[in-house]
UniProtKB/Swiss-Prot annotation:
<comment type="subunit">
    <text>Part of the 50S ribosomal subunit.</text>
</comment>
<keyword id="KW-0687">Ribonucleoprotein</keyword>
<keyword id="KW-0689">Ribosomal protein</keyword>
<dbReference type="InterPro" id="IPR001063">
    <property type="entry name" value="Ribosomal_uL22"/>
</dbReference>
<keyword id="KW-0694">RNA-binding</keyword>
<keyword id="KW-0934">Plastid</keyword>
<dbReference type="InterPro" id="IPR036394">
    <property type="entry name" value="Ribosomal_uL22_sf"/>
</dbReference>
<comment type="similarity">
    <text>Belongs to the universal ribosomal protein uL22 family.</text>
</comment>
<dbReference type="GO" id="GO:0006412">
    <property type="term" value="P:translation"/>
</dbReference>
<comment type="function">
    <text>The globular domain of the protein is located near the polypeptide exit tunnel on the outside of the subunit, while an extended beta-hairpin is found that lines the wall of the exit tunnel in the center of the 70S ribosome.</text>
</comment>
<dbReference type="InterPro" id="IPR018260">
    <property type="entry name" value="Ribosomal_uL22_CS"/>
</dbReference>
<dbReference type="GO" id="GO:0015934">
    <property type="term" value="C:large ribosomal subunit"/>
</dbReference>
<keyword id="KW-0699">rRNA-binding</keyword>
<dbReference type="GO" id="GO:0019843">
    <property type="term" value="F:rRNA binding"/>
</dbReference>
<protein>
    <recommendedName>
        <fullName>Large ribosomal subunit protein uL22c</fullName>
    </recommendedName>
</protein>
<dbReference type="InterPro" id="IPR005727">
    <property type="entry name" value="Ribosomal_uL22_bac/chlpt-type"/>
</dbReference>
<dbReference type="InterPro" id="IPR047867">
    <property type="entry name" value="Ribosomal_uL22_bac/org-type"/>
</dbReference>
Length: 147
């Protein structure tokens, strides 16, 4: 009997030092896409939040491939969310011994990668499996694009 593993890999980033709106505009573009497509999109986005999210996705994919038998080609982002966090409060020194308060916005980022091959039998031929994966991926992507 083979041991069943979870088809999902989670990555949490807490207290990420960027506002939730700025991180959310990057996350909204990658939600529901495949791992490879996500990497291409994140490399080309001009936003500051794109590179750290790129690192989170790569980290999740390496965790998925090392902890289970999933391949990076079969991964897609099933869930990606950004939650606001209370602002970090600092004091900035000013002239004449005064100080002004600074509120630095932060957020929590959650990314979930799901392995599509987990949902198929091992008895399926490789060419049929590729066609099934493509159909399932296109169906899931269609759901997320209607957000």
């Amino acid at each position: 009997m083979t041991k069943k593993t979870k088809p999902e890999t989670y990555v949490f980033s807490q207290n990420f030092p960027i506002s939730a709106d700025k991180a959310r505009r990057v996350i909204d573009r990658i939600r529901g896409r495949s791992y490879e497509e996500t990497l291409v999109i994140l490399e080309l986005l001009p936003y500051r939040a794109a590179y750290p999210i790129f690192k989170f996705v790569c980290f999740a994919a390496s965790n998925a491939s090392s902890t289970s038998t999933s391949k990076k080609e079969n991964l897609f982002i099933s869930k990606a969310e950004v939650n606001e966090r209370p602002a970090i409060k600092k004091l900035k020194p000013r002239a004449r011994g005064r100080s002004y308060p600074i509120k630095k916005a932060t957020c929590h980022i959650t990314i979930v990668l799901t392995d599509l091959s987990f949902y198929f039998n091992e008895l399926v031929e490789p060419q049929q499996e590729k066609n099934l994966l493509t159909k399932l991926y296109l169906n899931l992507r269609g759901l997320w694009d209607k957000k």
